[in-house]
Amino acid sequence: MAKQLRPMSALASTATSYPTTHEKIEKPTDTPYFVDNEFRPSQTDKFIELHDPATNNLVTRVPQLTNAELQAAVDSAQRAFPEWKAKSVLARQQIMFKYVSLIRENWDRLAASITLEQGKTFVDARGDVLRGLQVAEAACGAPEYLKGEVLEVAKDMETRSYREPLGVVAAICPFNFPAMIPLWCIPIATVTGNTVVLKPSERDPGAAMILVELAKEAGFPEGVVNVVHGAHDTVNFLLDAPEIKAISFVGGNKAGEYIFSRGSANGKRVQANLGAKNHAAVMPDCNKNQFLNAIVGAAFGAAGQRCMALSTLVMVGETKEWLIELAESAKKLQVNGGFEEGADLGPVITPQSKARIESLIASAEEEGATILLDGRGFKPEKYPNGNWVGPTIITNVTKDMKCYKEEIFGPVLVCLNVDTLDEAIDLINQNEYGNGTAIFTRSGATAETFRRNIEAGQVGINVPIPVPLPMFSFTGNKKSVAGGGANTFYGRPGIVFYTQQKTVTALWSSADAISQKADVAMPTHS
């Protein structure tokens, strides 16, 4: 039997206990849902099998909840909202402090669930948890963001503004960050006074189940945080439920544009981060060793399954000669099961993802690109049945090739050649995506030219994955975000998304009204 991190409580989620090896689980149990602070088995007859990506052994079955079960979660959140809203922000903050502490205490348990279900290396999975934890820590400072404004606008008259919660909100989360994305949503939504219905990815819900277990332990009342499961039917239910006032989504463009359109049509606020094709411009004056190390990590970490993975290089001038060295560095990466010591990257999420990635590599070959490093057909000796794609570098790519136009979402780096910085900027700006970009250079003037003219929402100067820390906000643009990027995640904009503004103007006159005639002209208070 696999080693267990913690004994399983009879009343707890299956997610409270996770192996730290990829050994076969002899008796997998079904994943429950979470309503009214309790784990409940679904009564559905429809389940989605979840397999360890390193072995394709069955880990659990995830239920497609019935409509009655979905409605129970929404009703729970709706019932909890008035009392939760009425709690002082300091009381909610104290619960958040406890929640942060519990996440830290259960860091390895959360990471183990991610490695088993999603495939990330254990070290990378710990980073997934940490980046979400940082948002939860920042949410503890919400009272500062929630402070309103006041102005004496005229004699005996003042105007005050308040930020108030929306009500029930929902989060639809992707497979690639099973802890981080739920933690982009739960802390900010709840500390501002909302209640939450969370749908983790059906491919790896375990981390979310641990997070709600910890939320209960931290002191969140019944109904404040609920978890539902399923695929399209669950998404549609959440989009249509009139009780839900806002939807948060991270994922691909097809799903995200659908969610934004249907959610908006139903009168909901929607924040939706979508796909990406993140470029880096490489200048001849850059620190070559720094560039080589940074790109190997940014392109191939998490098997390339990051919305901010640096998947495209724009080699300026002579830098194209460095790609041989880049391939040599990438060859040294250890591709293995995520629990194995020394593993640098694990498998991709499903056999279907592997097939799609390999087909895009093949298309590049057919269209005349060069496969400088080919990760197809790779199999670690210990795990021959996993969804393996090794690091792959494709050179001599042109922008009309399929491998360039599509988001590959795997450990594949495509490389294009240009002669000048201006050409690099033009090429990057012509791409329809705008999540992030980077430039590698020693020149401040070059960096400033790039910063000023580039059209991506998050820019790194010698930083390959410029995801902002939680005191800022995640600011993709163009087709990488729905709705023009108005509703962004975390930071002050995250607080704004989960709250609505109320403005109150009050007149407190010490003198009695002496006029006998009403004034029907537009009041100007001047």
Would you name each region that the model predicts?
Residues 3, 8, 57-61, 244, ...:
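Conserved C-terminal structural/oligomerization subdomain of aldehyde/semialdehyde dehydrogenase
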Residues 5-54:
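Hydrophobic face of amphipathic alpha-helices that form TPR/SEL1-like repeat modules
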Residues 56, 92, 114, 136, ...:
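Residue-level signal for inorganic ion chemistry
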Residues 57-146, 156:
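Glycine-rich loop-to-alpha-helix module at the N-terminal edge of alpha/beta enzyme cores
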Residues 59-65, 80-86, 171, 280-283, ...:
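Short, well-ordered beta-strand elements within core beta-sheets of diverse protein domains
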Residues 81, 85, 100-107, 111, ...:
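Structural signal for hydrophobic packing residues in well-ordered secondary-structure cores
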Residues 148-290, 418:
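Rossmann-like NAD(P) dinucleotide-binding subdomain of oxidoreductase/dehydrogenase enzymes
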Residues 254-398, 421-422, 427, 461, ...:
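ALDH superfamily catalytic-core signature
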